[in-house]
Amino acid sequence: MSDILCLYYSRTGTTRTVMEQIAELLEAELVEITDGKNRMGIIGYLGSGLDAMKKTPEELLPFETAKPLSAYTHVILATPVWAGRCSSITRSFLIGHGKDLPKKVSYVITHMGDSSYDKVFAQMDQYLSTPHTFGLSLQPKADDYHQKVYDFVRTIRAENGQEAQ
């Protein structure tokens, strides 16, 4: 296993699927963060978007990593985009743990729209000690989905001195 940690929140399973692929390709530890709320269906969808717009912090359920967050060489944090923002769960994680993360932090954001999501990366960066290293903006139903994932993994490997596979 590498010194890379893949952390994610996923409401519907889409972000989870992406991070499972990335973690497997990087031989990285994979950890889910959640608040434990049922956010499924239209009510969950609307509530999640409202939480993101209000920037409502959520109380997260405890999560375990193999070592302290600062001990990893690289952390990859993934979130769905809700109402043009990172999920309230991801924001809560960053508020509570952003300063504990190593200098190398990269983001994976999943979304359905065609817009530029650079603002989401900037929103997330405000909770870190240094700006993110790399960002992957991913539309899971897009034709170039798999290529973008593989290119991102190659970039992370190169940054961390791992051989390409």
Summary of predicted features, one role per range:
Residues 89-95, 120-122, 148-153:
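Charged helix-capping and loop-helix junction motifs
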Residues 106-144:
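Short, glycine-/small-residue-rich phosphate/pyrophosphate-handling segment
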